[in-house]
């Protein structure tokens, strides 16, 4: 029967009360949903948009934010790399604006040419505490290639890795030298050639010249450069690294310092005719020919006269070192014999051939890198938005799945915890409810008192106990206690029960604490790195025993009397009668046991030092220390899914607890 009748519900006051109640409930729902939306939104962000708070990611609807995230991802989250390639300052990713329309002809020619450019590095392959698409795909390709055997990968690719989570793509070559010719580098380059051309970062020596020399020397204000050189450039984008050294003295000095000391040697070439100076350099660098041969076993010679002058970057690292040191020698290596040949020069030749005009008529051309990046972004908006939305979740799932035993360990741990909790706690509560010993409330008080101490207080004592667990004394003492109870109940029936229990307990303590250690010599065993170490500390729960005891007390005693008349055993009464009528409270117990086992990470980390026994929560805890804030949010969302599913499964059973007393 409703509290308010249908007639009463027609009045304005009652409707106003109803409306107020629903409004308050709606506010409560919003207050819960909005923080959830903030966390879900934060789980699909990166460094670019992590500062934007809102219930949805802005790059879903704003092309500007999408372009910022695309540039961040492509340039491996290194602002310096993007600035050097773009040839202009960026500052932060959030300051990037949509580029203005430039020369469409140059852009189309650049897009047609860039697949032929030999100077590039794969973008979206690495990042600071984030794993972009190509980095994740590279790891997956190697995982499939070696069937998940990290040792085989380390051996065949000559790249030692202890675990798959430590495997990352090699970083872009820094400073002057390229990567050495190693199997792991070759594997990455082979993978890079399978990725889309739009993911390639085209090297830009002009941008390097601005970023690594002009700005440190003349600040980022181009007017300072203009005053020093007598020029009228509007920006550093108009300052190019010429193929040959300029005539103007200060520009020539800038060119010399940058090319000799900073520019990667892959862009530097020497004119023929420096054989004698180069041989003199080697004779001064190496005391004897034998010393040279020892350092250059791949190119042993009888005398320095047999050494050829390198015209470009050599292949071996020792030859590259000689090449760099020779470049720095201003006496033996004149500036007139050095020239630069890089992507811009090749692009200019491509444009000249395509337009059938002399190269001199179009040089210098500023490569439209920014416009090309924007074109690539706008041409793949749907795929990019999906990738940015899912990549953090893919990163977390890859991290979990690459630790093959993490899921298995968690599943075993949760099953053991729930199963044993559904066995131990109901048995204890049934004994207190069914037999009602005089010490019932003392036992309940002792169980409830354990809740006064936080779990962190017992971590160290539990660790010490599990490290030196008295397994054999417990078995011996328990067996002695059981035998003593049976013997005393058989031969001393007239003795009070409390006295018999006390005597049996004393016998068990004597056997367990003294006799067994004396006989075995080593009574302790270590339970660390076992499932027993995870399950035993939470095997019995005082609060659940108290809760179950109260629920069992509500079961009518007439049911047990009827079972006694039918000749039911105590186990039958417990299992078929008590447990079958207690499914709602058992669902609460199972949900609590699962939540406690699934979410445990600190205790699991303490008692399980072996990584092979770690659970998912321990791995996610480790992931959060090395990952971006958005990845942490994604890991929390994924970690909450199993608990949510278990709660949904148990919810219907728990709700039956409202009507079960009526049924009984």
Annotate each predicted stretch with a short phrase.
Residues 2-115, 360-664:
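A hydrophobic, multi-pass inner-membrane permease signature
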Residues 54-387:
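Polysaccharide-binding and catalytic clefts of secreted carbohydrate-active enzymes
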């Amino acid at each position: 029967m409703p509290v308010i009748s249908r007639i009463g519900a027609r009045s304005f006051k009652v409707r106003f009360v109803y409306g107020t109640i629903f409004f308050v409930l709606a506010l409560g729902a919003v207050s819960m949903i909005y923080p959830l939306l903030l966390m879900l939104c934060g789980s699909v962000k990166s460094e670019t948009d992590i500062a934007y708070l809102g219930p949805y990611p802005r790059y879903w609807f704003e092309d500007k934010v999408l372009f910022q995230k695309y540039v961040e991802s492509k340039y491996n989250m290194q602002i310096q790399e993007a600035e050097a390639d773009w040839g202009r300052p960026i500052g932060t990713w959030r300051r990037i604006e949509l580029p203005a329309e430039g020369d469409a002809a140059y852009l189309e020619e650049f897009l047609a040419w860039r697949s032929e450019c030999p100077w590039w590095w794969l973008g979206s392959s690495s990042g600071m505490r984030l794993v972009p698409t190509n980095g994740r795909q590279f790891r997956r390709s190697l995982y499939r290639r070696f069937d998940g055997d990290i040792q085989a990968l380390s051996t065949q690719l000559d790249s030692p890795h202890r675990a798959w989570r430590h495997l990352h793509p090699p970083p872009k070559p820094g400073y002057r030298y390229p990567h050495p010719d190693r199997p792991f580098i070759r594997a990455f380059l082979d993978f890079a050639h399978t990725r889309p051309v739009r993911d390639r970062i085209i090297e830009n020596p002009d941008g390097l010249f601005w970023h690594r020399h002009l700005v440190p020397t003349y600040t980022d204000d181009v007017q300072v450069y203009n005053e020093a050189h007598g020029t009228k450039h509007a920006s550093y984008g108009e300052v190019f690294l010429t193929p040959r050294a300029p005539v103007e003295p200060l520009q020539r000095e800038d060119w010399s310092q940058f090319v000799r000391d900073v520019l990667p040697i892959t862009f530097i070439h020497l004119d023929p005719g420096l054989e004698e100076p180069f041989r003199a350099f080697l004779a001064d660098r190496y005391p004897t020919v034998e010393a040279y041969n020892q350092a250059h076993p791949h190119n042993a010679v009888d005398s320095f006269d047999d050494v050829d002058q390198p015209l470009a970057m050599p292949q071996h690292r020792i030859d590259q070192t000689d090449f760099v040191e020779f470049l720095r020698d201003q006496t033996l290596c004149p500036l007139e014999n050095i020239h630069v040949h890089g992507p811009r020069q090749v692009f200019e030749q491509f444009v000249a051939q395509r337009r059938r005009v002399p190269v001199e008529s179009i040089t210098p051309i500023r490569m439209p890198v920014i416009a090309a990046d924007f074109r690539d972004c706008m041409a793949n908006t749907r795929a990019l938005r999906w990738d940015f939305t899912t990549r953090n979740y893919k990163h977390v799932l890859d991290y979990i799945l690459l630790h093959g035993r993490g899921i298995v360990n968690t599943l075993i741990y949760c099953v053991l915890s729930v199963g044993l909790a559904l066995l131990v706690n109901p048995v204890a509560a049934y004994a207190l409810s069914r037999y009602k010993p005089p010490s019932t409330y003392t036992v309940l008080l002792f169980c409830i008192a354990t809740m006064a101490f936080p779990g962190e207080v017992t971590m160290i004592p539990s660790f010490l106990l599990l490290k030196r667990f008295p397994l054999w004394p417990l078995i011996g003492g328990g067996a002695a206690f059981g035998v003593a109870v049976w013997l005393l109940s058989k031969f001393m029936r007239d003795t009070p029960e409390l006295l018999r229990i006390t005597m049996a307990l004393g016998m068990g303590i004597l056997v367990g604490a003294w006799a067994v250690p004396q006989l075995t010599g080593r009574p302790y065993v270590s339970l660390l790195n076992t499932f027993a170490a995870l399950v035993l500390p939470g095997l019995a729960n005082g609060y659940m025993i108290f809760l179950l005891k109260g629920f069992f007390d509500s079961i009518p005693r007439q049911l047990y009397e009827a079972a006694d008349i039918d000749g039911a055993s105590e186990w039958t009464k417990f299992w078929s009668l008590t447990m079958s009528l207690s499914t709602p409270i058992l669902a609460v117990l199972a949900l609590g046991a699962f939540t406690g086992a699934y979410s445990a990470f600190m205790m699991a980390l303490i008692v399980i030092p072996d990584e092979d026994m770690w659970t998912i929560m321990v791995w996610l805890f480790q992931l959060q220390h090395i990952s971006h804030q958005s990845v942490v949010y994604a890991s929390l969302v994924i970690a909450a899914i199993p608990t949510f599913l278990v709660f949904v499964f148990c919810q219907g059973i728990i709700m039956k607890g409202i009507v079960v007393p009526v049924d009984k």
